[in-house]
Structures are given as structure tokens and as C-alpha cells.
From Swiss-Prot:
Residues 26-376 are lumenal. Belongs to the glycosyltransferase 6 family. Keywords: Glycosyltransferase, Golgi apparatus, Manganese, Membrane, Metal-binding, Signal-anchor, Transferase, Transmembrane, Transmembrane helix. It holds the Pfam family Glyco_transf_6. This is N-acetyllactosaminide alpha-1,3-galactosyltransferase. Mn(2+) binds at residues 233, 235. The gene is GGTA1. The active site is at 325 (nucleophile). Residues 1-4 are cytoplasmic. The conserved DXD motif is involved in cofactor binding. The manganese ion interacts with the beta-phosphate group of UDP and may also have a role in catalysis. Substrate binds at residues 142-147, 233-235, 255-258, 267, 367-373. It comes from Alouatta caraya (Black howler monkey).
Amino acid sequence: MNVKGNVILSMLAVSTVIAVFWEYINSPEGSFLWIYHSKNPEADDSSAQKGWWFPGWFNNGIHNYQQQEEDTDKEKGKEEEQRKEDDTTQLWLWDWFNPKKRPEVVTVTKWKAPVVWEGTYNKAILENYYAKQKITVGLMVFAIGRYIEHYLEEFITSANRYFMVGHKVIFYVMVDDVPKVPFIELGPLRSFKVFEVKPEKRWQDICMMSMKTIGEHILAHIQHEVDFLFCMDVDQVFQDHFGVETLGQSVAQLQAWWYKVDPDDFTYERRKESAAYIPFGQGDFYYYAAIFGGTPIQVLSITQECFKGILLDKKNDIEAEWHDESHLNKYFLLNKPSKILSPEYCWDYHIGLPSDIKTVKLPWQTKEYNLVRNNV
């Protein structure tokens, strides 16, 4: 073969190789990754890998590592900004709570839950956080029989003034005689819902059956209406701000007469036959059933478990010493509350006013049992 023929054949061969190669790298399957086997499943996306390898190599003959690093830095920057944004939506205990401000009292439990006393919380930080969350707080109260005319109006009027000021509140009022409910003018962000409940012959049964009623209403509608729910006795009156520092997953109230007493002296249910039984040597605090709360799901758990215990006691023909309160204390022994309110939040002035009570949020009303209870 002459020289001219060899040159032509060589040129054809080179052209063919170049054409095949070019077609290959531009095909969906084309990639340099065929030369090794990767165990990384993300490396099997050949089209993505081809886009990474080839445009850079043919960009003025220089692979664009710098651009790759800049893209990585941008991604890291976005992740860092997202973390910072997430941090601003989280409220950590140490952001608002300082137990050292009240060294003379118990401010932290053995399970590291805060005991909220006046002076231990930063109200500004809490208000700023919850304002952004746009929360709704429910307050449920029972007024049965003569409790309606003796206590209900003053309770709701004072709650309208002091309870969760600046936040949306729904008052759930459970009564056995709806026409007797007084008209109460509420402030902005407050609404009032009245529900009729079945009356019971004994006040003990009213207290115990309230656990069932609370649970039923949470399931029926409250869980969809509020972010937090408090259940309170009606024979109390607010006299100072009861605010967002009290909000938590599950919230228990220290009983004013028992917060300095040794647990073995608490009036727990001590009979083994009762579902509310707590043996000597056990117990953390004595909790008052006049106030408890938390998220709707947690309050549902509290009321359902307490009512189970009440039904079991009825089946065994026994009644716990302090009825629903005994079962509440048993519940919180087994399921520790995430936050505890000091006696400042529910105080009895008959005790006096010791130095550790800096302010009284919600004092007890005078207990006129002879006027409001059918069976004393």
C-alpha cells in the first residue's frame, strides 16, 4: 500500500475512534466510572458523574475544583444558617430558668425538672418565645350546684385579668345548670365555652368523675383547639399574673400545707387495696389536685390513668383517702411531671405568709363546704 493510502487509513481510524469516543461520553451510559467498581450507591448515577467530570476538563483545559469548593462552602453556610434558625425556635431550660436565684427552696427535682418560684424565671424571654409560637391555652373549671353562684363569676373574672395575659385563651366551663351561668365580659383573645355535665349526688363523685369528663372533652375537641390545658378548682381567685412560665409537657402543683413536710408524713393513700396506694419510703412531693396541666395529650394520659384507678377502687369497694387527688399523686409518682409550680401559684392564707412565699398568684377562697356541698 502506498504512503497516501496509509495516511488515509490512519486518518479514518483516528476519526472513527474520536467519533465513537465522543458519542460514548455524550450517551446516557457514558462515563469514566466504568474503570472501577464502587460500593457507594450514589456513584452509580452516571449522568451526574459525567456532568461533574467532563465540563470542567473541557473548560479551558482546567478542572474547576475551585467552583466545587465554593459550592460546598455555600451548602455548609446554608446548613449553618438553618441550624441557627432552628436554635431560635428552641427554648432551652437554661435560657429562661435560674435555680440559683432562690437558694432557700427546692428549685430542681431529682429528675432535673424545674420547680418554678418567683424570681427563678426570665419573663421577657418566655413571652418573646411564646408570642412567636402563637399559642392557645385552655383553662377548664367545674362549677357544680351552688359552686356556680358562690365562685364561678369571681374565678373567671380574675382569670380574664391575670391568666396568660397577651395570649389566646379558651375557658371551658363545666356546669350542671347552664341557665345559672353568669354573663361575664371577656377581654381580647379570650373565649368562653359552657358545657353541661351530669350532676352527682356526692361531692366525692363529682371530683372523681371530673377525670372522666376532662378526658372525654380532650378527645372530642380540646386536643384540636389548644396547645396547653390547665384544669383548676373553681374556689380560687387569681390575684397576680399566672403566665407562660407555668407551661410544660406535664405540670403539677405543690400543695401549700405539705411542701415542707417529710414524704412519710404525706397524706398519701396508704392502704394496699387501693390503686392509689403509695407505700412509706416512697414519694417525692405532695401534689394538689386544684391545679394540674400540660399538653392536651399529657392531660389526657393523666385523667385516663387516674380514672382507671378510681374505677378499680370502686370495683374493689374502696375509696382513696383524698379521692381524685390521691390518684393524681400516684400518677405523678410513676410519671414524673416535667414542671412543678411552687405553692406561690396556689396558696392558702390561713397558713400565714412565710418568707419563702414572695408573691401569691392564686389564693384559695374560703372553703364554705356547709353552703356548697350536699354531703359534707
